[in-house]
Amino acid sequence: GLFDIVKKVVGTIAGL
């Protein structure tokens, strides 16, 4: 769902 997309974005930022 939409929250999954948000989590993906947060994970990408954390990956930086």
UniProtKB/Swiss-Prot annotation:
Q: Which UniProt keywords apply?
A: Amidation, Amphibian defense peptide, Antibiotic, Antimicrobial, Immunity, Innate immunity, Secreted
One Gene Ontology term, aspect cellular component: extracellular region
One matching Pfam family is Antimicrobial20
| Annotated tissue distribution | Expressed by the skin dorsal glands.
Question: Where can this protein be found?
Answer: Secreted
Q: Please, which domain of life does this record's source organism belong to? A: Eukaryota
Any GO BP annotation: innate immune response
Instruction: Fetch the InterPro entries from UniProt.
Output: Aurein_antimicrobial_peptide
The coiled-coil segments of this chain are none
Protein function: Antimicrobial activity against B.cereus, L.lactis, L.innocua, M.luteus, S.aureus, S.epidermidis and S.uberis. Probably acts by disturbing membrane functions with its amphipathic structure. Shows anticancer activity. Strongly inhibits the formation of NO by neuronal nitric oxide synthase (nNOS) at micromolar concentrations. Acts by a non-competitive mechanism, probably by binding to calcium/calmodulin and as a consequence blocking calmodulin attachment to nNOS.
- Give the UniProt family note: Belongs to the frog skin active peptide (FSAP) family. Aurein subfamily.
Protein's name in the database: Aurein-2.4
Which organism was this protein described from?
Ranoidea aurea
